[in-house]
Design a protein with these regions (language model features):
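Conserved acetyl-CoA-binding loop-helix of GNAT-fold acetyltransferases
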Residues: 62-75
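Short amphipathic alpha-helix that is part of the acyltransferase structural core
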Residues: 1-17, 30, 120-121
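Conserved active-site alpha-helix within GNAT-family acetyltransferase domains
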Residues: 79, 83, 89-112
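Cytosolic beta-strand hydrophobic patch enriched in CBS
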Residues: 26-30, 86
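Active-site beta-strand termini and strand-to-loop segments that position acidic
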Residues: 30-32, 112-114
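Conserved beta-strand in the GNAT
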Residues: 28, 34-42, 47-55
Length: 121
């Protein structure tokens, strides 16, 4: 677990580290005896699951590791009978290459940065 936490720490602000214990399935990619990537599947219901905490060590990026990890999450979701799989990401083109799409009919998540935020009063 320490190796996984170390990998996730390489991506501060990009991965939700506090939710690591809540994931349903967690997958790792290895090179020899080293963990070089990880990805989690969070199942919310019989219908919906999320691909999350996807990380690949910078020395091993652009070699298909991330795609294999997402494919494994997708396989697990299918095995569990999940109907819809989503990812919250800033790398939309990566997920689009794997068959994910943005649905305009869905609600949009809106965020407000509160650190340093001052009230209008």
């Amino acid at each position: 677990m320490a190796a996984i936490r170390g990998l996730i720490r390489l991506f501060p602000g990009q991965l939700v580290q506090k939710n690591l214990p809540r994931v349903t399935s967690f997958f790792v990619a290895t090179a020899g005896d080293k963990i070089i990537g990880c990805c989690a599947l969070q199942v919310y219901s019989k219908r919906l699951a999320e691909v999350r905490s996807l990380a690949v060590h910078p020395d091993h990026q652009e070699h298909g590791v991330a795609a294999k990890l997402v494919e494994r999450c997708t396989e697990r979701a299918r095995e569990e009978g999940i109907k819809e799989l989503f990812a919250v990401t800033s790398r939309t083109s990566f997920f689009e290459r794997l068959g994910f799409a943005t649905f305009r009919r869905e609600k949009t998540a809106m965020f407000l940065e509160l650190s340093g935020h001052t009230s209008a009063e």
